[in-house]
Curated annotation (Swiss-Prot):
Pfam families: Gag_MA, Gag_p30, zf-CCHC. It comes from Baboon endogenous virus (strain M7). The gene is gag. One of its GO terms (molecular function) is zinc ion binding. A zinc finger (CCHC-type) spans 501-518. Residues 137-221, 302-322, 443-471, 514-537 are annotated as: Disordered. This is Gag polyprotein.
Length: 537
């Protein structure tokens, strides 16, 4: 049995229900047709190393994301939802993606601030003059100082008192080293550091250590490494610029003309820019008319989720989830950000609901495949038409048969003939129909082949016309020659002229043809003579 090659694109298409659920968690929506089109046709043309079968390489995904989210005219706002969903599949891989991911070669570390232990006992100050037991230390040679290494210097701390030296045991014959310096700063809330087991100090110390005398045992090395602590993140805010609003309004159709395109644009803006409540109002004010804005707000208030996740009908919950006046949400807190997320989600649902037009199947039937349009692009336009002019989802299983019949009937003639000859059309899925149509589309002649064929057909038509004209001229010439020949033969068959006294029969002179003795004569019967008393019959 043969083996099937699994690619990132085919893997995501097989588990597309999980992909759609992942996108829903990111507050965006993705469609299977566009997912396949962007991966196999659009992103390879960005020249960042994206293969036609997709990839799980995070560096390539981030390069595509940079190109797609370009704020200039070369950006692709309609593709943002798809590339960030792809990125999330790699950053938080589901079980069916993990076997295909590359293991990172290096690990990243986070540098955090050190915290001084809280319960720190201050060492007593060292005596100014040594006692009698330590006088012998004055006559010994001092130990050499270690080489200065700036990497081993501790970070600066704001300590209320200068550092002090730890006491040295009288029995220790060595002088204190620079590593025995201890900071005396004591922050109010920090646990005491654990003590290390007795051991010899390392050759190259990386931690701040000090030597302390135990009560009943030898000296121990205690660590002064402070516990790590995290720092609160601060949310940065960038309002919309006037140029952004102008470009969005100028380079995109109006909501009444193409609601799907403008909805995709606003969806990408909500995802990438993370706008506040005021920014959302500014966006609606610029991109929508008054009537369109009222319809969007009305539909959005119908889709405010309740405690169970379903749309609620309670006015107080609707006003709380989708307020019409400026709320007092604190975006630095988790509840404030959650309220803003629910507001954006309801606003996006309102845009999609207001973009649906009255049911008009006649509009759907007018969507036909173009002369040079690919089957995948035609299928995408057809699905958009169903979403725009019908109330049902064309990708739902119960409506796929209707979409399939429309795709076959409204396709190009050569593709339509091929699809109509398939066995069991009702059992074929939409993707299977597109693949069969692609086979016919890819076998079409190129423009060069078409031009050569037209030239050849023109030459053949001219040859047939010349042959027909030559044949007609041949018939005319043949008729003329035949007539001339007939005229000449008629002249030769005329009787020769005779003189006035010459017989035309025997050519002798002295009599005419009627009196020619050599001419045979017919025996005439004598006319009957009637007698008296007989009647003629």
């Amino acid at each position: 049995m043969g083996q099937t090659l699994t690619t990132p694109l085919s893997l995501t298409l097989t588990h597309f229900s999980d992909v759609r659920a992942r996108a829903h968690n990111l507050s965006v929506g993705v469609r299977k047709g566009r997912w396949q089109t962007f991966c196999s046709s659009e992103w390879p043309t960005l020249h960042v190393g994206w293969p036609r079968d997709g990839t799980f390489d995070l560096s390539v995904i981030l390069q595509v994301k940079t190109k797609v989210m370009d704020p200039g005219p070369h950006g692709h706002p309609d593709q943002v939802a798809y590339i960030i969903t792809w990125e999330d599949l790699v950053r938080n891989p589901p079980p069916w993606v993990k076997p295909f991911l590359h293991t990172p070669s290096t690990s990243k570390s986070t540098l955090l601030a050190l915290e001084v232990p809280k319960n720190r006992t201050l060492d007593p100050p060292k005596p100014v003059l040594p006692d009698e037991s330590q006088q012998d230390l004055l006559f010994q040679d001092p130990l050499p100082h270690p080489p200065h290494n700036p990497l081993l210097e501790p970070p600066p701390y704001n300590s209320p008192s200068p550092p002090v030296l730890s006491p040295v045991s009288p029995t220790t014959p060595s002088a204190p080293t620079p590593s025995s310096l201890v900071s005396s700063s004591t922050p109010p809330s920090s646990p005491a550091p654990p003590e290390l087991t007795p051991r010899t100090p390392p050759q190259t110390p990386r931690l701040r250590l000090r030597r302390a005398e135990g009560q009943d045992g030898p000296s121990t090395w205690q660590s002064s490494l402070f516990p790590l602590r995290t720092v609160n993140r601060t949310i940065q805010y960038w309002p919309f610029s006037a140029s952004d609003l102008y470009n969005w309004k100028t380079h995109n159709p109006s909501f009444s003309q193409d609601p799907q395109a403008l909805t995709s644009l606003i969806e990408s803006i909500l995802l990438t820019h993370q706008p506040t409540w005021d920014d959302c109002q500014q966006l609606l004010q610029v991109l929508l008319t008054t009537e369109e804005r009222q319809r969007v707000l009305l539909e959005a208030r119908k889709n405010v989720p309740g405690p169970g996740g379903l749309p609620t009908q309670l006015p107080n919950e609707i006003d709380e989830g989708f307020p019409l006046t400026r709320p007092d949400w604190d975006y630095e807190t988790a509840p404030g950000r959650e309220s803003l997320r629910i507001y954006r989600q309801a606003l996006l649902a309102g845009l999609k609901g207001a973009g649906k037009r009255p049911t008009n199947l006649a509009k759907v039937r007018t969507i036909t495949q173009g002369k040079d349009e690919s089957p995948a692009a035609f299928m995408e336009r057809l699905l958009e038409g169903f979403r725009m002019y019908t109330p049902f989802d064309p990708e739902a299983p119960e409506h796929k048969a209707t979409v399939a019949m429309s795709f076959i009937d409204q396709a190009a003639l050569d593709i339509k003939g091929k699809l109509q000859r398939l066995d069991g059309i009702q059992t074929h899925g939409l993707q299977e129909l597109v693949r069969e149509a692609e086979k016919v589309y890819n076998k079409r002649e190129t423009p060069e082949e078409r031009e050569a064929r037209l030239i050849k057909e023109q030459e053949e038509r001219e040859d047939r016309r010349d042959r027909k004209r030559d044949k007609h001229l041949t018939k005319i010439l043949a008729a003329v020659v035949t007539e001339k020949r007939a005229g000449k033969s008629g002249e030769t068959r005329r009787r020769p002229k005779v003189d006035k006294d010459q017989c035309a029969y025997c050519k002798e002179r002295g009599h005419w043809i009627k009196d020619c003795p050599k001419r045979p004569r017919d025996q005439k019967k004598p006319a009957p003579v009637l007698t008296l008393g007989e009647d003629s019959e």
